[in-house]
Amino acid sequence: MPKPRRVFLTILILLVLPLAAQAMTVRGRVTLSDGSPLPGVTVSAGSVTAVTDPDGRYELVLPDGGSVRVTAALQGFQTRAATVDGGGDATQDFTLHVSYGQEITVGSRAIGAEAEKAVPVDIIPEEQIRSSPSTETAQIIQKIAPSFNFPRPTITDGTDTVRPATLRGLGPDQLLVMVNGKRRHASALVNANNSVGRGSSGVDLNAIPASAIQSIEILRDGASAQYGSDAIAGVINLVLKSDAEPLSVSAKAGMTTHGDGQVIDTSVSGGFRLGRGAIFATGEYRDRYETNRAEADPRDQIRAGDAGNNAVAQPNHHWGDSYARDVMLFSNLNLPLTEDGKQVFYAFGGYSNRHGSHGGFFRRALQAQNQPQIYPLGFLPLIEPRVVDTSLTAGARGELATWFYDFSAGYGKNDFDFYVTDSLNTSLGPTLQTNQTRFYAGTLGDKLFTVNLDLSKEYKVGLAGPLNVAGGVEYRREGYAIEAGEPNSYRDGGFPDQFGNRAPAGAQVFPGFRPSNEVDTSRNSKAVYLDLEGDVLAKLRVGLAGRLEDFSDFGNTSNGKITVRYSPLRQLIFRGAASTGFRAPSLNQSYFSAVSTNFLRDPATGQLAPFEVGTYPVSSDIARALGATALRPETSRNLSAGLVFQPLANFEVTADYFNIDIEDRIVFSGNFTGPQVLPLIQPFGVTGARFFTNAIDTETKGYDLVANYQLGAGGWGRLDFSAAYSNNETKIVSEVATPPQLAGLSEVLFDRIERRRVECGQPKDNLRLMQSWNRGGLTATTRESRYGEFCSFTLLPIDDQIYDAAWLADFELAYDWRNYTLSVGAENLFDRFPDRNRLGTPQANFGIFPYPSQSPYGMNGRFVYTRVAYTF
C-alpha cells in the first residue's frame, strides 16, 4: 500500500475512534489545607487536562467509563493523585500542601506563581512537553519560547553534535541552566567555527531526556546576584518528575517527506514508591538520522587530463542535520526522613551517551589535501564524536529550628571524544601502508563540583506581610582538560602532496590535539549571598539580593539586584527589576588550544579555501606576541519593567521591556593569516593564529509579550490559546579593544563576520502561537511559529544577504483510549525552507550549499511522525 494511503487511513481511524467511546466526566475542587480554594492547579488524566478556576474547581471530560488516574499538580506544592472508578460521572477533590521536596520557582526564593513574580518567568508544563512534535529538549523549548534560539549548524566540527542554544539573542554561555534548581555543568566543546555562539561553551540541554522533565522554567531576567556567573540573559531550570506514577512506555517514529532525517525515539519511565518517598526513573533511546540538502558541485573533481574530469556535477557534500544516537538514563529521588515529611533526602542525576557523525568539506580528487591513490574520486571526511555526560546531586532539605534549609553537593562531567573517519593524513603518503583512514583525535573534558547551603525564613517585622529572608554559601570547583590524539592524527609524516609541495599535517577535517595542546587545569570559587523580599505595603512588594564571589584565577566580584512589584488592582500587576551581573571567563576559553583546517575566503579567488589555523590560549607565547592578555569577567547591567493583566480568570497578558548592557564581552578573534601579522607569528613556525579576548561592549534591548486564554466550550470540550512574541536587538556600542601589537588590525581581531554574527546572526523577533482543543480523549493541537529575519556571516558587503522571516506550522492529533495514547502529526506542515544562499557568494560555495546553516529552524522541510504511548 502506498505510504500516503497508509498515513491517510491511520488518521481516519483515529478520527473515528472517539465516536465509539462512551464519555465520562470527573469534577472536583482543589483547596489548601485550610480549605481556601487553590486556582491555577493543573488537573490531568492522561492527555486530558484542566486548570482550576478562581474557586479551585475543575472538570475533565474523559473518553470512556473505565478506571482512570487523576493528578493535581502546582509548582511549589506536593502533587496529589487518585484513581477514579468508572461507571458514570464522578467527583474527586484534592487538598494540596506546600512541598519541601520540590524546588522553588526561579526568580525568587519566595514561593509563588509565575504571574506573582517581579520578573518574567515562563512555565512550560508537562502536557506541552509531551505534546511537542520534537523529542529533543532544546527543540521543545524553541517551539514554545520565542526568546530562545536553537539553530542547526552544519560543517562546524563538534558543534554539529552539541548545538548551541541562546536566550534573547545573547551567547550560549550567557545563559545559566539548572536542574531542580542546581547549576548544570557545561559542555566541554568550544564552538570554534562558523556557528551562532562562536567562541562559547554552553550546556548540552539534549543530554537530559524530555521524558524525565515535569516542567521547564525560563527566567527572562539577569540573575547573577542570585545564582552567580552566566545568568546574564536569564536562567532555564528543568524540574524533574518526582512522584510515584504508573510505568509508561512511549515510541515515536518519523521522517522528512524528502526521504531522510528518520527519527526513532523510545522511552520507558515511571515513579515508584520507596518508603514514604518515591523515585522516578527514565530511560530513553533516540536515533536521529542525517538530512542532506547539498546540491551538486559544478567544479572539476579530478585533475585535468584524467578521464571524466568533469563529466557531470557531483553531489558529494553533506549539508544538513548530522546523525546522532542518544542513550539516556535519568532518575530523581525524594525520600522523607520524618513522618511529617518536613525533612527530605533527595538525589537526582543521569547518564547520557551520544554517538554523532557529520561531514566536513568534501576533498576533491585534485585538491592538495587528497592523495588520489587512496581516494581517486575524492573523499568526504567524517567527524564521529562520542559524548559522555554524567551527573549526580544529593542533599537534604526541610525545616530546622524554624528555618528552611537546603544542603546539597553535586558533580557533573562531560567528555567529548573526537574520532575522524573516511579521512587521511596527507603528509603520511599516498598508500595505506604508511597512511590510515580512521583516527582518534583526542578528548575534551569539563567537570563541575558544587556544594551549597541555602537558608530561608519568614519574619514578621511590622510590614504589610512577612519578610522572607534567604541566605547561603556556595563552593564551586571547575575543571577542564585536553587529551592528545593518537600521533598519526596530528603529526607531519613528511610526504609531499600530489603536486610535490609540502602536504598539510594531521587528519583531514580535524587534526588531532597534540601533546603541546594538552592541559589539565582547575579553579575554585566561593560565594555568599543574601536575599530579602517582602510586602512593604499592602500592594507593594520589594526584593533585594546581593552576592559576593571570589574566584581563584581572577579575584572578587560583587553583584546586586532590586525588584519591585506593585498591584493596584487584583487583576493588574506592575513589575520591574534592576541588577548587575557577570560571567566569569570559562576555563575552555582560557586554555583551549588546537590546530584545525578552516575554510576561509581566499582573497585571490573570493571563494572558500582551506587554511590551517591554530587556536592559542592567552597565556601562550604566540598569543602574547599578538597582544593577548589574561581574560577578564564580562560585566552587565540589566533593567526590566513590565506588567501582568488578568481581566478574566481564564485570560492573562504579560508585557515586559528589557535592556542589557554588557562590557568586556569575550570574543573569539578573527583568523590572523595575512601578511601584516606574519612577522609576529612566523618565529613560532605557524601561518595562522587566533585567540580569545575581551574586545567589545554591547547593548541588547527589546520586549516580550505573552497572552494565554482558556475557554470551556461546554459539551464541545476545552479550547486553549496562547501567543508569545519576543523582540530583541543587539548592537556593539564600543570600539574594538585592540592591543598595540595589532594596531590597525582591529578589523581582523574582531572582523566584519563576527560583528554580523553578534548583531544580526540571530532573529531579532519571533512569534509563537498555539491552539489546542480537547474533548474526551481527543486532542488537536496546532502551532504557528514566525522566525524573524537574520543575516549572513560575510566579510565583504557585496556578499551580504538578509534572509526573510518565515512562518512555519505544526499539527498534531492525539487520542487517549484506555491506557493508550496514539498521535500523528506534522512538523513544518507546509514544507517551508529558508531563503536560498545567493549564487556567487562564499555562503553558497559554488551553489553546493543552498541554504544558510544558521537558520533557526534548520533546512529539513516537512517532518511527519506517529507516536504511541502505553501506561500500565
Kindly give the residue locations of the regions a language model identified.
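Extracytoplasmic beta-strand/coil segments of soluble accessory domains associated
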Residues: 141-188
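N-terminal periplasmic accessory domains that precede
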Residues: 91-94, 137-140, 144, 163-166, ...
